[in-house]
């Protein structure tokens, strides 16, 4: 009996040791700090993206094109602001909540009355090469499934650097919905100087580019 007990204890300890090597800091709490190695991986992703100002200008140009195409093929549609979103976000959304960067979202615009299905097909047909040239791909299906056919109501877009454009047509019961989001990007000035004091981690005010825990450095304190 004692031998069986000792064997069981040893087995349990072995399993515990194995699990300890596999469990990540945020395994049980997805909002917990995932560890310095993972934070550095995410920071390198953001550092490799274009400056925030570059993305803002690209989205401003695309915004003008989107509105022009809607006005061209659906002149009856008028835009209004439905939901106001903060234009200046100090920090980034998940999974980059502990990353040094900034993210901005547009307001949510509604177009009434919505384009007819025929008008919508003309609109998205003209927008398709514009989005492709800007590096976007459709973001209107679940992962693993092909995009919805051209002319489907949802013609939302996504780009590899995290930029998103939500563009969904309505019908005779609801309006067209449109908004965009820059994704997490470093402002150009943050590559040559630290962020303003009020935008640095409260416990790590001496952060500097490239904002890494590993070489070549830039962060020294664990993120909250």
Curated annotation (Swiss-Prot):
S-diacylglycerol cysteine-type lipidated residues: 22
Keywords: Cell membrane, Lipoprotein, Membrane, Palmitate, Signal
Residues spanning the signal sequence: 1-21
Chain segments annotated as coiled-coil in the UniProt record: none
Covalently attached lipid (N-palmitoyl cysteine), positions: 22
Membrane topology according to the record: Lipid-anchor
Origin: domain of life: Bacteria
InterPro entries for this protein: LppA/LppB/LprP
PROSITE patterns from the UniProt entry: PROKAR_LIPOPROTEIN
Pfam families: LppA
Subcellular compartments: Cell membrane
GO cellular component: plasma membrane
Family named by the database record: To M.bovis LprP.
The protein's name: Uncharacterized lipoprotein LprP
Annotated gene: lprP
């Amino acid at each position: 009996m004692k031998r069986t007990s000792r064997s069981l204890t040893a087995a349990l300890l072995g399993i515990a040791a194995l699990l300890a090597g596999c469990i990540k800091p945020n395994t049980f709490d997805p909002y917990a700090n995932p560890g310095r190695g993972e934070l550095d991986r995410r920071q390198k992703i953001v550092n490799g993206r274009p400056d925030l100002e570059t993305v803002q200008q690209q989205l401003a140009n695309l915004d003008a094109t989107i509105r022009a195409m809607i006005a061209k093929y659906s002149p009856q549609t008028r835009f209004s602001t439905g939901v106001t979103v903060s234009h200046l976000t100090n920090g980034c959304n998940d999974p980059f909540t502990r990353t040094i960067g900034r993210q901005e979202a547009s307001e949510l615009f509604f177009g009434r009355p919505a384009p007819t299905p025929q008008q919508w097909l003309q609109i998205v047909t003209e927008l398709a090469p514009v989005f492709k040239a800007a590096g976007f791909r459709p973001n209107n299906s679940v992962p693993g499934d092909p995009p919805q056919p051209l002319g489907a109501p949802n013609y939302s877009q996504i780009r590899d650097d995290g930029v998103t454009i939500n563009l969904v047509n309505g019908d005779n019961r609801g309006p067209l919905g449109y908004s965009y989001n820059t994704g997490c990007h470093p402002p150009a000035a943050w590559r040559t100087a630290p962020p303003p004091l009020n935008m640095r981690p409260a416990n790590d005010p001496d952060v500097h580019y490239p904002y890494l825990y590993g070489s070549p450095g830039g962060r020294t304190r664990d993120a909250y």
